[in-house]
C-alpha cells in the first residue's frame, strides 16, 4: 500500500502548501461526533443499569468508551514538531567593506569568499544571539584586514633598514680575522723549541732506573727459595705431632663417654627406683585416705539410703499422679500436649564460670565493647546508664586492636554495677564477646554450676559450641556477627549483625551444639529431657524460630508456637499485639488482660513457647530471627516488607513455660557398696656408680721458620708534560641579506540568517495546574493553552497569525468559555471534525508590528472543555501558520482518566472496580455458600481508590464528593451498624467518613437523592451510604495517594429466613467525583430447617412405620422419633449447636431414661473421615431431663459439631423411649435448635383407652426392638435417669445442660 503524503494547505505559498493544508481544509470532511453534555448523561429515574462497555469499568453514568481519534487529529499528532519555511534576518556590514578597500590600495591581495549560512534558529533570543555573532564577526574581519594591511606596510620599511646594517657588520668581521692569524703563527714556533729540550733529559734518567731494578729483583728471589725449604720441613713435623696428640685425646674422650653413659644409665635406673618407691608410697597413702573417706561415706550413705529411697519413691508417686491430671488437661490452655515430667532442672546459674575458645573467630576486649556501646545507635541509652544490646552498632567492635587471648567479661559489673541492661534490668548480667563470620564457631565451657541437675544428679559442667549459620542473610559488609555469650548459661546468647540500619530480607541464625557433664566429668546421656524454647516472637515483619534440632517438638495447648516444615515458630498467627494477625494477647504489658506474656514470670508466657524432648549425649538446635517475607508470602497484615534489626537474644534452659510441669529433684538412690582396704607396697634397692678414666700426656709442637725481608725497588722517573700547539683562528662567517616581505592575502565573507519561532501546547485543570501525562477524573474541566514564542527582531511585517486545533474524541468543547478565555482572537469551531481555529485580530497584528527592530511577545488562546470517558487518554496538539510562509506543529500533550490498565504515564491506573465479598466469622469467603439463619455475614466492601494515585483533579471536581452505597436485602438481613469498621489498605482506622441508613430512596434527603440520581444509581430498597465528611481532606488522605479502603459491615441473617428458606443478593456502589461504579453481586442461600416428629415402636431408622394418630395401649413402651432439620453441604460456618428439646406430657408419658441418636445422612469430618448414615452418634451427645415439668433436652457436644467439615451435610435423629402411664389423648411437639435458632416440628397425637376395671392388669410385655443394621453391635439407648429397663444397659450419668432460649416453650395440655 502506498503511503499518502500528508500536507498542509495555504493560499499563494509553496511553503504553506507543503505543511498545513489538511488542517485548514478539515472542514470539508464529515465526521459525526456524538457527544452530549456531561450533566445530561448523569440524570436517571430508573433502577440502576450498569452498562457493559469497552472500558471494562462498571460505570453507572457516562459508560460510553472513548471513540476513535479524528483523521485530522491523528495526522496532526503524527507530524508533531514538524516545521516548514522561515523568516530571514539582515545584519549591516559597512565597516568590513571599507577595510577591504583600504587593503587593496596598500598592495594587499584581497579575496571575497562565498557567503556563510548561519542556519535557521528557533527563538527570537537565538536570533538576537546569532545577529550579535554576525556583527562581531564583521567587526573582527574588518580589524583583521586592517591589521594585515598595517603590518605589511611596516614590514617593507623594516626590510630596507636591515639590509644597510648587515653590510657594515660583514666588513668589520673580515678585518679582525686577518689580524688574529698573524699572532697564531708566532706562538707555534716558541712551543716547539721548549718541548724538544724536555724530552732529552727524561730519556737519560730512564736508562739508570732500569739497571738498578734488575739487581734488586735477583737478590730477593734467592732469599725466598731458602725460606720455602725450611717451611716444608716444619709443616711435616707439625702434622706428625698434632696427629699423635689427637689420637690420644680421642681415646680418652671415648673412655669418658662410655663411663658417663654407664653411670647415666645407673643414675636413671636409681631415679626410676626412687620414683617407683615414692609413687607406690603416695598411691598407697592416697588409696588408704580414699578408703578411709569411702568407708566414712559408705557408712553415711548406708544410714541415709532408706530415707533417700523413701523420698525418691514419694516424689515419683506425686509425679505419676500429676501426670494423670496433666493427661486429662493436655488440651487446655498452657498444658503440654504430651505430658511429661521435667528431668532436667536447669533454670538459673548466676555463679557459673565462663571460658571461651575459638580457632577462627576473635575474642574481644571488654574496653572495646564498652567504647562501642558509648557511640552510634547505643549511645543514647548508654548516656542513661543502660546497656541496650539490640541497639549496639557492631562496627564499633571491628578494630585492629580489639582482640584478646582470653575471655574478658563485660556488663553491669564493676564500675557499672548500678547500671541496667535490657536483658536483666537491675539484675547483674555479664557476658564475653566474640566476633564470628558465617560458618565460624566459638566454644563456651560453663563450670561452678550450683543449681543444675538431671534426674536428681548434679551437673558439673556444660559445653556449648556456637556456630554462625552459613545461610544467614544479614547484610553487614564485613560479614561479622557479634556474639555476647552470657556467663549464666541459662541466659543464652545475644547475636547481632546490626550496623545501625534496619534491613529487609535479612536473617541471623546460630547453631547450638551442647553436652552436659556429671560430677565425674562424663557426658550425661539424656532420655527425653525437656528443653524450653520460649519467647519466640512473631511480628508482621519478623519471625523468631528454631530449626535443625535433635529431639522431638512438644506443643503447648493454646500456644501460638507450633512446628511446620521442621521449624518451630508461630506458624498461624502473629503474637505481638492483640487483635493483629490473630494474636490473642499483646507481648508487652499495656493494661489489657493477658498482656505482657513475653516474660518468664507471666502466667501465660506459654503463649510464645514450646518444648523439645532431647535424648543422647550430644544435641543441637539452631535459633534465630528472619524477615517474615522470607518465610511466608508478602501480606499487609502477616508479612510486611519493612526492615528489622538483624539480631536476637535467645536462651536454652529447662524452664518449661507450660503450667504444672512436675520436676524430678530426687535421684534414684542405689544401695551403697562397702569399700576394700588397700595393700601396703614393697620398695626396691638403688645400684652404685663406676669410677672415672685417667687423662693422657700430649707432645709439644715445633717452632715455625722466619723469612728474610725483601730489598726495596728503585723509583721510576716521570715522563715530562709537553705544551700543546694552540688552535688557529676560525674562518670568518658573513651574514646574508634578508628576504623582502611577501605580499599578504586577506579574505572576507558575508552571512545569511533565518528564524523559526517555536510553539508549546500546555494542558491545565480548572485550577490552572499542569496535568500533562497525569490523571484527572471523568467530567473534569480540561484546558488547552496554545502558546507561541516571541517573534524575532528584524522580521517582516506579520499579516496573518492562525492557530488550528483538532480536538480529541470524547472531549466536550465549550465554545463560549473558549472565547472568553481567548481575547485577541477570532474563534471558530467545526463540529464535523471537532476542530477549533483561532485567528489573530487586526488589533493583535498591529501590536505584533509596532516595532519590527525588536522582538515581540505573543498572546495565546485557551481551549475549554470536559473529558467524558472512563479509562480514556486525551491527546492533542495544534498548528501555527504565520504570513502563509512559516508553519509549525506543536508538541502533543495528553491526560488520562482513571479506569485504564497499562497506562504508561500512570502505573497505578487500572479498572475502577469496587468489590464485595461475604465472609464468615473466621474470615473465610462464603460467596455462593449456604448460610444458616441467625448467622452473621461479614460483608467486606472494597472502596477501589488505587487507580486515582497522583490524580490532579481540580477543586470543583473534588467537591462533588466521595460516597459508598451498600444496597443490601433488608428482607433477609438485619443491619449491624454498630459493628461497622472502616480501615485503609494498611489496616489503619479511617476517620472522617460518616454512614447513614435509609429504609428507601424516597426516605433519603434530597441531597442524597441528587447524588445518586446524577451517578445513575437507584437502590432497590433499604440502603446504607458512606460519605466523606470533608471531600478535600478525604481526597488528600486517600484518593490522590491511591489507598483503597475496606468496609466491614456485619449483617445477621433474620431468623424467619430459616422458616421459609430462600436466596438473597447484595450489591454495592462507589461514587467518586460524581461518577458511579457498581460492585459484583454476592448471592447466598438460606436452607429451610424443617424438623419432623414421629411415634415408633422400634429403634430401626429404616422402619418408617409411624403410629402418629393411632392408639397406644396402656403401659406400652414406645419411642418419640425426633428428626432434626438437614444442614446442606457447603454451608458457611461451623455448627456449634444442634439440640432436640421435647416438652412431653408427663401426665400420660413417663421418660424411661433411655435415648439414642443416629446420623441421618453421611457426615464428613474435618480430618476427612466419614460417618455413614445410620451410625450411632449417642456418645457425642448429652441429655438433661426435668421429670417434674416433663422436659427433655438432647444436645450434641460442641467439639464434635465443630469437627464436622463445613463442606459436609449434617442431619441427626433422636429416639426417646417413653412408657404410656395413663389413658387419654396426648399431643406432643418438639423444638430443634440449630446455632441458637429454634424450629418447631409437627405435632403428633396418640390415644390410650381406659383399661377395664374388672380385669386384673397383665404384666406388660416389653416391645422387641430391632438392632441397627448398619452397626456391628446391638443398638442400646443410654440412660439419663434411674428408671428400670430390662433390655437396655446402663450407660452412665449424663451431664445436665440448659436449654438455650427455649425454657418458656409449653406443651399442649390434654
From Swiss-Prot:
Return the Ag I/II A repeat spans. Answer: 146-220, 221-302
The domain of life is: Bacteria
Entries under Pfam families matching the protein: Adhesin_P1_N, AgI_II_C2, Antigen_C, GbpC, Gram_pos_anchor, Strep_SA_rep
Start and end residues of each stretch annotated as Disordered: 40-90, 330-349, 663-736
Q: Would the keyword Protein biosynthesis turn up in this protein's UniProt record?
A: no
Give the range the annotation lists for the signal sequence: 1-38
Q: Where is the motif named LPXTG sorting signal mapped on this chain? A: 1277-1281
Q: Which Gene3D superfamilies match?
A: 2.60.40.740, 6.10.250.2200, Major cell-surface adhesin PAc
Report biased composition (Polar residues) as residue ranges.
43-60, 75-86
Where is the segment annotated V-region (lectin-like)?
297-668
Q: Where is the composition biased (Pro residues)?
A: 703-717
List the propeptide region positions: 1281-1310
**Which residue positions does Pentaglycyl murein peptidoglycan amidated threonine occur at?**
1280
| UniProt topology in membrane | Peptidoglycan-anchor
The subcellular localization recorded is: Secreted, Cell wall
Task: List, alphabetically, the GO terms of the cellular component aspect.
Answer: extracellular region
Keyword terms of this UniProt record: Cell wall, Peptidoglycan-anchor, Repeat, Secreted, Signal
Tell me which NCBIfam families the record gives. isopep_sspB_C2, LPXTG_anchor, Streccoc_I_II, strep_RK_lipo
Sequence similarity: Belongs to the antigen I/II family.
- The protein's name in its UniProt record: Probable cell-surface antigen I/II
Upper classification of the organism: Bacteria, Bacillati, Bacillota, Bacilli, Lactobacillales
Gene encoding it?
Answer: pas
Amino acid at each position: 500500500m502506498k503511503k499518502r503524503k500528508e500536507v498542509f494547505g495555504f493560499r499563494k505559498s509553496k511553503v504553506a502548501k507543503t505543511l498545513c493544508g489538511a488542517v485548514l481544509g478539515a472542514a470539508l470532511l464529515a465526521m459525526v461526533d456524538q457527544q452530549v453534555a456531561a450533566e445530561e448523561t448523569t440524570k436517571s429515574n430508573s433502577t440502576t443499569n450498569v452498562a457493559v462497555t469497552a472500558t471494562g469499568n462498571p460505570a453507572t453514568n457516562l459508560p460510553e468508551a472513548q471513540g476513535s481519534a479524528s483523521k485530522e487529529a491523528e495526522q496532526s499528532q503524527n507530524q508533531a514538531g514538524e516545521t516548514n519555511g522561515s523568516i530571514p534576518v539582515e545584519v549591516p556590514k559597512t565597516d568590513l567593506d571599507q577595510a577591504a578597500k583600504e587593503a587593496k590600495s596598500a598592495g594587499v591581495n584581497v579575496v571575497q569568499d562565498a557567503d556563510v549560512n548561519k542556519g535557521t534558529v528557533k527563538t527570537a533570543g537565538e536570533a538576537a544571539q546569532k545577529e550579535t555573532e554576525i556583527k562581531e564577526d564583521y567587526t573582527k574581519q574588518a580589524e583583521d584586514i586592517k591589521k594585515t594591511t598595517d603590518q605589511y606596510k611596516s614590514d617593507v620599511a623594516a626590510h630596507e633598514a636591515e639590509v644597510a646594517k648587515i653590510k657594515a657588520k660583514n666588513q668589520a668581521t673580515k678585518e679582525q680575522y686577518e689580524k688574529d692569524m698573524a699572532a697564531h703563527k708566532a706562538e707555534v714556533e716558541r712551543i716547539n723549541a721548549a718541548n724538544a729540550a724536555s724530552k732529552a733529559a727524561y730519556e737519560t734518567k730512564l736508562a739508570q732506573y732500569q739497571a738498578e731494578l734488575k739487581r734488586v729483583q735477583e737478590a730477593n728471589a734467592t732469599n725466598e727459595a731458602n725460606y720455602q725449604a725450611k717451611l716444608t720441613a716444619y709443616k711435616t713435623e707439625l702434622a706428625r705431632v698434632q696427629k699423635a696428640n689427637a689420637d690420644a685425646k680421642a681415646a680418652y674422650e671415648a673412655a669418658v663417654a662410655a663411663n658417663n653413659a654407664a653411670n647415666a644409665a645407673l643414675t636413671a635406673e636409681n631415679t626410676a627406683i626412687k620414683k617407683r618407691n615414692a609413687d607406690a608410697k603416695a598411691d598407697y597413702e592416697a588409696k588408704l585416705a580414699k578408703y578411709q573417706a569411702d568407708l566414712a561415706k559408705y557408712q553415711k550413705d548406708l544410714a541415709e539410703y532408706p530415707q533417700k529411697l523413701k523420698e525418691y519413691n514419694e516424689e515419683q508417686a506425686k509425679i505419676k499422679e500429676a501426670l494423670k491430671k496433666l493427661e486429662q488437661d493436655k488440651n487446655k490452655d498452657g498444658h503440654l500436649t504430651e505430658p511429661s515430667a521435667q528431668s532436667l532442672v536447669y533454670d538459673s546459674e548466676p555463679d557459673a564460670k565462663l571460658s571461651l575458645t575459638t580457632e577462627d573467630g576473635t575474642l574481644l576486649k571488654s574496653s572495646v565493647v564498652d567504647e562501642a556501646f558509648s557511640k552510634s545507635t547505643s549511645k543514647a541509652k548508654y548516656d542513661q546508664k543502660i546497656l541496650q544490646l539490640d541497639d549496639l552498632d557492631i562496627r564499633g567492635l571491628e578494630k585492629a586492636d580489639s582482640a584478646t587471648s582470653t575471655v574478658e567479661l563485660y556488663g553491669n559489673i564493676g564500675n557499672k554495677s548500678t547500671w541496667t541492661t535490657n536483658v536483666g534490668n537491675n539484675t547483674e548480667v555479664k557476658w564475653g564477646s566474640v566476633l564470628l563470620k558465617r560458618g565460624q564457631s566459638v566454644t563456651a565451657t560453663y563450670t561452678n554450676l550450683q543449681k543444675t541437675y538431671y534426674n536428681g544428679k548434679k551437673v558439673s559442667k556444660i559445653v556449648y559450641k556456637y556456630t554462625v549459620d552459613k545461610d544467614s542473610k544479614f547484610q553487614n559488609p564485613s560479614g561479622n556477627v557479634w556474639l555476647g555469650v552470657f556467663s549464666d548459661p541459662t541466659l543464652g546468647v545475644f547475636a547481632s549483625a546490626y550496623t545501625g540500619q534496619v534491613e529487609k530480607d535479612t536473617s541471623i541464625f546460630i547453631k547450638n551444639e551442647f553436652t552436659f557433664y556429671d560430677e565425674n566429668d562424663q557426658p550425661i546421656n539424656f532420655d527425653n529431657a525437656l528443653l524450653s524454647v520460649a519467647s519466640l516472637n512473631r511480628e508482621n515483619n519478623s519471625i523468631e524460630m528454631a530449626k535443625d534440632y535433635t529431639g522431638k517438638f512438644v506443643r503447648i495447648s493454646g500456644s501460638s508456637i507450633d512446628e511446620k516444615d521442621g521449624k518451630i515458630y508461630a506458624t498461624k498467627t502473629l503474637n505481638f499485639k492483640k487483635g493483629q494477625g490473630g494474636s490473642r494477647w499483646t507481648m508487652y504489658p499495656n493494661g489489657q488482660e493477658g498482656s505482657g506474656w513475653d516474660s518468664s514470670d507471666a502466667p501465660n508466657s506459654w503463649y510464645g513457647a514450646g518444648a523439645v524432648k532431647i535424648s543422647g549425649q550430644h544435641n543441637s538446635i539452631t535459633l534465630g530471627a528472619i524477615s517474615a517475607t522470607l518465610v511466608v508470602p508478602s501480606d499487609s497484615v502477616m508479612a510486611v516488607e519493612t526492615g528489622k534489626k538483624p539480631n536476637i537474644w535467645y536462651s536454652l534452659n529447662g524452664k518449661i513455660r507450660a503450667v504444672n510441669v512436675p520436676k524430678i529433684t530426687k535421684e534414684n538412690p542405689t544401695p551403697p557398696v562397702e569399700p576394700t582396704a588397700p595393700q601396703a607396697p614393697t620398695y626396691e634397692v638403688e645400684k652404685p656408680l663406676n669410677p672415672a678414666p685417667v687423662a693422657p700426656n700430649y707432645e709439644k709442637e715445633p717452632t715455625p721458620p722466619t723469612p728474610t725481608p725483601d730489598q726495596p725497588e728503585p723509583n721510576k722517573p716521570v715522563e715530562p708534560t709537553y705544551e700543546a700547539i694552540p688552535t688557529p683562528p676560525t674562518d670568518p662567517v658573513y651574514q646574508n641579506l634578508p628576504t623582502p616581505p611577501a605580499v599578504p592575502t586577506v579574505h572576507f565573507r558575508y552571512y545569511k540568517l533565518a528564524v523559526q519561532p517555536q510553539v508549546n501546547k500546555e494542558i491545565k485543570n480548572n485550577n490552572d495546574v499542569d496535568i500533562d501525562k497525569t490523571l484527572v477524573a471523568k467530567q473534569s474541566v480540561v484546558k488547552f493553552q496554545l502558546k507561541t514564542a516571541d517573534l524575532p527582531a528584524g522580521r517582516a511585517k506579520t499579516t496573518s497569525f492562525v492557530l488550528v486545533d483538532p480536538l480529541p474524541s470524547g472531549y466536550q468543547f465549550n465554545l463560549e468559555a473558549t472565547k472568553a478565555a481567548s481575547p485577541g482572537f477570532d474563534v471558530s469551531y467545526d463540529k464535523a471534525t471537532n476542530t477549533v481555529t483561532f485567528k489573530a485580530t487586526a488589533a493583535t497584528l498591529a501590536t505584533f508590528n509596532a516595532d519590527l527592530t525588536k522582538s515581540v511577545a505573543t498572546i495565546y488562546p485557551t481551549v475549554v472543555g470536559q473529558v467524558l470517558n472512563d479509562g480514556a487518554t486525551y491527546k492533542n496538539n495544534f498548528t501555527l501558520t504565520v504570513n502563509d510562509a512559516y508553519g509549525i506543529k506543536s508538541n502533543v500533550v495528553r491526560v488520562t482518566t482513571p479506569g485504564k490498565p497499562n497506562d504508561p504515564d500512570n502505573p497505578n491506573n487500572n479498572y475502577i472496580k469496587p468489590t464485595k465479598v461475604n465472609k464468615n466469622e473466621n474470615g473465610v469467603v462464603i460467596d455462593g455458600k449456604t448460610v444458616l439463619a441467625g448467622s452473621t455475614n461479614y460483608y467486606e466492601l472494597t472502596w477501589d481508590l488505587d487507580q486515582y494515585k497522583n490524580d490532579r483533579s481540580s477543586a470543583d471536581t473534588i467537591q462533588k464528593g466521595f460516597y459508598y452505597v451498600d444496597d443490601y436485602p433488608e428482607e433477609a438481613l438485619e443491619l449491624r451498624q454498630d459493628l461497622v469498621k472502616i480501615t485503609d489498605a494498611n489496616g489503619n482506622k479511617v476517620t472522617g467518613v460518616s454512614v447513614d441508613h435509609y429504609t428507601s430512596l424516597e426516605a433519603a434527603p434530597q441531597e442524597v437523592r441528587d447524588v445518586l440520581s446524577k451517578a445513575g444509581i437507584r437502590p432497590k430498597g433499604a440502603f446504607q451510604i458512606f460519605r466523606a465528611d470533608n471531600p478535600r481532606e478525604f481526597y488528600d488522605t486517600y484518593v490522590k495517594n491511591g489507598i483503597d479502603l475496606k468496609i466491614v459491615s456485619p449483617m445477621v441473617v433474620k431468623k424467619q429466613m430459616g422458616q421459609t428458606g430462600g436466596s438473597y443478593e447484595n450489591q454495592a456502589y462507589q461514587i467518586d467525583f460524581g461518577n458511579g461504579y457498581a460492585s459484583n453481586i454476592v448471592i447466598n442461600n438460606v436452607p429451610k430447617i424443617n424438623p419432623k416428629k414421629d411415634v415408633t415402636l422400634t429403634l430401626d431408622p429404616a422402619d418408617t412405620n409411624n403410629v402418629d394418630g393411632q392408639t397406644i395401649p396402656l403401659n406400652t413402651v414406645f419411642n418419640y422419633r425426633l428428626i432434626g432439620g438437614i444442614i446442606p453441604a457447603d454451608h458457611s460456618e461451623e455448627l456449634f449447636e444442634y439440640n432436640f428439646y421435647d416438652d412431653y406430657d408427663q401426665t400420660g408419658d413417663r421418660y424411661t431414661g433411655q435415648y439414642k441418636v443416629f446420623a441421618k445422612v453421611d457426615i464428613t469430618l474435618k480430618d476427612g473421615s466419614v460417618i455413614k448414615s445410620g451410625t450411632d452418634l449417642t456418645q457425642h451427645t448429652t441429655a438433661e431431663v426435668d421429670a417434674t415439668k416433663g422436659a427433655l433436652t438432647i444436645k450434641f457436644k460442641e467439639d464434635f459439631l465443630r469437627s464436622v467439615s463445613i463442606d459436609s451435610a449434617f442431619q441427626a435423629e433422636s429416639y426417646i423411649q417413653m412408657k404410656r402411664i395413663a389413658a387419654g389423648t396426648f399431643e406432643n411437639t418438639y423444638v430443634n435448635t440449630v446455632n441458637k435458632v429454634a424450629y418447631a416440628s409437627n405435632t403428633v397425637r396418640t390415644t390410650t383407652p381406659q383399661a377395664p376395671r374388672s380385669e386384673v392388669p397383665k404384666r406388660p410385655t416389653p416391645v422387641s426392638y430391632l438392632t441397627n443394621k448398619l452397626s456391628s453391635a446391638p443398638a442400646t439407648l443410654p440412660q439419663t435417669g434411674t428408671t428400670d429397663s430390662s433390655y437396655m444397659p446402663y450407660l452412665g450419668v449424663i451431664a445436665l445442660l440448659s436449654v438455650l432460649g427455649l425454657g418458656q416453650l409449653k406443651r399442649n395440655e390434654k
